[in-house]
Amino acid sequence: MAGRVKWVTDIEKSVLINNFEKRGWIQVTENEDWNFYWMSVQTIRNVFSVETGYRLSDDQIVNHFPNHYELTRKDLMVKNIKRYRKELEKEGSPLAEKDENGKYLYLDFVPVTYMLPADYNLFVEEFRKSPSSTWIMKPCGKAQGKGIFLINKLSQIKKWSRDSKTSSFVSQSTKEAYVISVYINNPLLIGGRKFDLRLYVLVSTYRPLRCYMYKLGFCRFCTVKYTPSTSELDNMFVHLTNVAIQKHGEDYNHIHGGKWTVNNLRLYLESTRGREVTSKLFDEIHWIIVQSLKAVAPVMNNDKHCFECYGYDIIIDDKLKPWLIEVNASPSLTSSTANDRILKYNLINDTLNIAVPNGEIPDCKWNKSPPKEVLGNYEILYDEELAQGDGAERELRNRPGQPVGPRAGRSRDSGRSVLTTWK
């Protein structure tokens, strides 16, 4: 039956096509009857647009949710997380607890961020509280480090404004929306270099939320040693880890591509910081990923024809606190090294094993919850049905003195939540 699956893609990457061909699937065009379409975010917009009026049949599935941008657009991700915090606060959830300075104890995992031009005055007010801070500015809808720059003076933004006297922000080239965030200027360094984590997370359904973590993530390193010096603010080889930028650096290594496996990072941290501290760090990373998904779940169009593999970008500071930087809807499938090619081939293979019933035609009624033995390098990160089914959340949430936050422990293998007291 596997040979009957008809596939289409508008992303010509060998790691995709080789996986489809290995399964004996048949390539067709988008105008023919197809069962599986691995598409770009531009195409998914057209497929689900009101104008197109395209209706997917039960034997058709696609690799994006219709409004994935609620998570993957930088401004909307922050907006949804802020809304989620306020909702938990209204409900009196222990997760929304704050310290004496009004800072969230457990939900402070995204750098302070403002939308421009909308929040320009709020940003200026915050900037003046800490005039020595550095901020990073990013266009909302771009990837691969495009259009990003760092600032440490208000005048650097006013240069972009047609009329700085009005304190309004207007880009000279377009009126494109930007986010501006406090720059994490104390990143954890290895070999003196800044790095971030790229982690892959597969969501098979948002309601109920079920997500999987891919165990083979990696670290991306800058090619130039880090310095917070203001003289290097414009040097993106110091500050941005994106391979699309670093590969143009003089010191870029084409053999390892400036990458480390997450397992190597874990071993390094265990040897330098200790096993307990390292385990706590990774528990916190898993916890904030699930919180970000819970933040967008209510607004996500949970179309049964969809699944999505996200690329999460996490930065760890020198106090071993993880920060969610952004989420990518189409993490790069370009292979920069031999190891990269193997990793991404296996990522697609394991993703297909969850999205499509084994040896069968795609079926939107399939719950995308296969037995553990076919998960490959994925492991269940959170399963809302199992978490609610055992009744543990409500009981633990009501117990006085019950620990909350990412330190409270997890049970990923059972499919229960990373945090025992989650909402």
Swiss-Prot record:
InterPro entries: TTL/TTLL_fam (IPR004344)
Region annotation Disordered: where it falls in the sequence: 390-423
Cysteine pairings via disulfide bonds: none
Keywords: ATP-binding, Cell projection, Cilium, Cytoplasm, Cytoskeleton, Flagellum, Ligase, Magnesium, Metal-binding, Microtubule, Nucleotide-binding
Listed EC numbers: 6.3.2.-
Amino acids binding ATP: K138, Q144, G145, S181, V182, Y183, I184, K194, F195, D196, T241, N242
TTL domain mapped to chain residues: 1-367
Annotated residues for binding of Mg(2+) 2: E326, N328
A Pfam family this chain is assigned to: TTL
Record-level GO cellular component terms: ciliary basal body; cytosol; extracellular region; microtubule; motile cilium
UniProt binding sites for L-glutamate: R220, K259, K344
Transmembrane annotation, as ranges: none
Function summary: Catalytic subunit of a polyglutamylase complex which modifies tubulin, generating side chains of glutamate on the gamma-carboxyl group of specific glutamate residues within the C-terminal tail of tubulin. Probably involved in the side-chain elongation step of the polyglutamylation reaction rather than the initiation step. Modifies both alpha- and beta-tubulins with a preference for the alpha-tail.
Recorded family membership: Belongs to the tubulin polyglutamylase family.
Protein name: Polyglutamylase complex subunit TTLL1
Protein species of origin: Mus musculus
Organism ancestry: Eukaryota, Metazoa, Chordata, Craniata, Vertebrata
